């Protein structure tokens, strides 16, 4: 299986092919995640791999509905403020991440792409706030960029009302939940199942099935999100959840729901822009 993070992206296209896509008024999906520890059973590229899978499937759905779409090479030098106490969690300063991301988006804009959508499945709030602030700033300067995320994320970040460049995606917790017996938010049942479905060769299945669920409570989250040694003390093996609860059938349903929800929001955004 091809495990390249450049699979299906512009990195595999020639420049005339990219120019042709621009002439076809193609939309651009920009995968934005990180390289981060995901316990002893998952690879550090988990967020990037899964974001890439989602982007390719969204692209395919959009193209089936007649909307030309390309995927930009992934941006994976972001912020890991919770897992920064672990080896393998690359984290850069907010200013560095913003500067690099701005210039990447400015490149796409200058070439003539009229719709640029950021897609990220990295749940670090400092990372997500950096994305939102970057997109809002660029959008204020007429950049055709937008950031899609679960609507609950924008609510927790305090964006109300939402600017047009922040696109909320409605995902029901009941629909996308796999593990319900414990807090499962990092390298647990959800991500382990998803990686087992899409990149089984990158999952240490024997290790995953031997791991015990973490016992964090809501009152522990305040300490956990501080990162560094505080987070590592609570989750010394680098996961928060139940990795042994691998459910391939359920994660397929979750993936389909995520693809549908994101695709629908992009199409609505494109139709709104066309009508303006």
Show which residues each predicted segment covers:
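Extended, histidine- and acidic-residue-enriched regions that form the cofactor-binding/catalytic faces
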Residues: 1-95, 99-115, 121-276
